[in-house]
Amino acid sequence: MAGSRVPRQLFLQGVAAVFMFAFASLYTQIPGLYGPEGILPARRTLRPQGKGRWQQLWETPTLLWEAPLLGLDTAQGLELLSLLGTVLALGALLTRQLHHPLVYLLLWAAYLSVCQVGQVFLYFQWDSLLLETGFLAMLVAPLGLPPNHKQAPQGRPGGVSPHEGLPFWLVRWLLFRLMFASGVVKLTSRCPAWWGLTALTYHYETQCLPTPAAWFAHHLPVWLHKLSVVATFLIEIAVPPLFFAPVRRLRLAAFYSQVLLQVLIILTGNYNFFNLLTLVLTTALLDDTHLAAKSSTSRRKRMPSSWPKALLAMLTLLLELAVYGLLACGVVHYFGLEVDWEQHVVRSRTMFTFHQLSQWLKTVTLPTMWLGAASLAWELLTALWRWVQVRGSLRKLCAAVQLSVFGTATVALFLISLVPYSYMEPSSHGRLWTGAHRLFSTVEHLQLANSYGLFRRMTGLGGRPEVVLEGSYDGHQWTEIEFMYKPGNLSRPPPIVVPHQPRLDWQMWFAALGPHTHSPWFTSLVLRLLQGKEPVIRLVQNHVPSYPFHQQPPTYVRAQLYKYWFSHPWEQGQWWRRQWVEEFFPSVSLGDPALDMLLRQFGLQDKSPPRAGGSSNTLSQALHWVRKQLSPLEAPALLWGLLGAVGAIKVMQALLGPQSLPRTKEEKHKPAPQEDSVAASKQASPAPNISSGSQTPRRKKSP
């Protein structure tokens, strides 16, 4: 069986990179979102209620409770955590010495602390996904065994612990839950766009932050959009069970299908770090053999030499072909695929009913849980077999302790995850073991396992609703307040901001889907714009002179609701077209009774002003200095700058101190090729230990 040492290293590096992006992206927005003059000041969320310290920490698990001990308020504590998280993640990305469980525990704890006070701006599925992935990374991070001076068994590197494959299996299970649920909820929501296979005819222009490529994708033929929806259902519903296939080529095919989907989403939409994190999860489908990039000669040497092995290889190939054929027949049958040779199109339509889907879901939900349990049982048996091979009493004892702890943790996390996974099918949720429910309810607030289901319903079927803020000095001449990232100016192309998530722009998209009373924070945004608070202005326009009211705050602010569509191909110089719908938020000014009433209704009036004197604290002054240095940079530039710095350092490390990646188990014990030894023997040399050892081992590019 191929090992997974290199994929685990890639996973840990990928998680570190995503944490770096998440912390740095949030850091740039903290003053405007959570500062004393922000939209939703964070200090309102952490108010002692007379409970004990540990009880308070358990009920609201955040390190920000300790911020006053450092002389910081809650917002400054957020900045400190974000900066430390960015630096720690950057270090883990650059050096493997920081691929330690404690490092990933700190990253997870810091992000959990941030999410506890993030309120509506951190209520996204990818924030929950990052927390769950970060906790798994803590378990995946290697814990070596004591050194062994005796030779390790064939195929077993001496420092590898038997339990290391168990937590990494949970990553595969998480990827399965994410993709399978995301596909199923599109149909269980009864959204007519998904059932009619027309979702992508709307998606590209109605998603929150499209990219320029989305404009071109939107104008593709309708039949291709519908075929793409069919492919999406195939990749998200039919392919994920192959994650647990015993045939590795089936797992690799599943891997490449998931990568294809995520890359296409990245090209057409700005979904911050979500798709990057999903790509990181797909490393659980890889193995060392696939990443070793061995030559064709070595592949020929692995061809079966005996007839039992040849028969097994033939049966495996037949199984692969049967699976591919079954998938193809299923897609053709359930989506009515037909080739229209006259029109040169592929026609598709949904050939099943909602009742049939519900019955199918009742049939497969519990079996998929048992599939996961069977796969986990195999991993446990494999880990036990590896433990049997450990040599040395001390090493065997340490390995037994590690296997017991991590095996128990793996089984417990699997049981916990079954509860949110079963949300998509109520009857299966009710039949789940009560112990799993109790275990989940105990740790639910830690977000160790979450339910997922992205793009449940397609919005904006009649055009994307968009809120446009306007300001005025006299109440007659109105000037639009243009945001940096969300659609507004008809002639401005959609930006590329990934992996940054502009949290305010995202919430403006959600606000447009309903009345402003469904988004209480919007009233606070209007108040801050009337007050001319610079931290909030920087969320709208980081370059303050680009903000139309940078010299003097507007006297009046209102909001209009428009419907936006992508422009037609023949409309030169425009990316969008729009139509006015209605007034979204009435014209208000400071002291307006209507505004004051809304602030009281939503509890947004600030009754406890921040304490003065915090600026004299040395740590507070240091945070202020860092903020002053970084504030001129736009968030995407900062994040891409960090990534560029990592790339440059990696290149310098490769040039100045080349070190090969950890070799796979097969490579470590692979004898030198015969032709190399023969060639070496022809070179007369008094030092025979140089002849065969001078060959530089094949190196893989650093990830």
Swiss-Prot record:
Residue positions the entry lists as glycosylated: 489
Predominant cellular place of this UniProt entry's protein: endoplasmic reticulum
Alphabetized Pfam families for the sequence: LMF1, LMF1_C
Biased composition (Basic and acidic residues): 663-673
Entry keyword set: Endoplasmic reticulum, Glycoprotein, Membrane, Transmembrane, Transmembrane helix
Example of a GO biological process term: protein maturation
Transmembrane segment boundaries: 10-30, 74-94, 102-122, 126-146, 165-185, 227-247, 259-279, 312-332, 364-384, 399-419, 637-657
GO cellular component: endoplasmic reticulum membrane
Region span, Disordered: 660-703
Membrane topology: Multi-pass membrane protein
Cell compartment(s), UniProt: Endoplasmic reticulum membrane
Stretches with biased composition (Polar residues): 680-696
Keyword Phosphoprotein: no
The protein's role, per its UniProt record: Involved in the maturation of specific proteins in the endoplasmic reticulum. May be required for maturation and transport of active lipoprotein lipase (LPL) through the secretory pathway.
Family in the record: Belongs to the lipase maturation factor family.
Protein name: Lipase maturation factor 2
Organism: Bos taurus
